[in-house]
Amino acid sequence: MRTIETMQRQLLGLIGRAVVKSISAATKCQTVDVSLIAGEPKAGVEHLEPYGFTARANSGAEAVVLFPDGDRSHAVVVTVSDRRYRLKGLQTGEVAVYDDQGQSVTLTREGIVVDGAGKTITFRNAPRARFEMDLEVTGQVKDLCDSGGTTMSAMRLAYNGHRH
């Protein structure tokens, strides 16, 4: 009986829940300062993120911490989640990327929805943008906007007002 209890304790010692205190994103591998559920502080824990994805969570987010070989001196954070900001109501199979400001990209069953939360959306470092579809625009369309260009509306007014 004692052997089973010992094994149980050892297995439970391999994984833990924690609360994020701070994150340092200055190095190649992000590090996280956490407080384990029992109040045990751990500083500089490596956060192993999936290739191609990175995020810097807010203080108060939750983390899952692994202790390889049960060695509590060398922990790794394998996931960080923040239920305060998680999008709700996704349908089965839908996927979203989101932040604490309400910005999101959601792959829905009807199509892709980009929500800029009232902020500018900027596309960078591309020679052109190509849209192989009809465009429906509810706001103004302006060309050469950084050098005093003109709007489509202004061009229409000039064209419609032209007489021969």
Q: Language-model segments: which ranges?
A:
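Low-complexity, small-hydrophobic/phenylalanine-enriched stretches
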Residues: G60, V105-L107, I112-M152
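Hydrophobic alpha-helical segments used as single-pass signal-anchor/transmembrane membrane anchors
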Residues: Y159-R163
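Exposed beta-strand/loop interface patches that mediate assembly or binding
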Residues: M1-R109
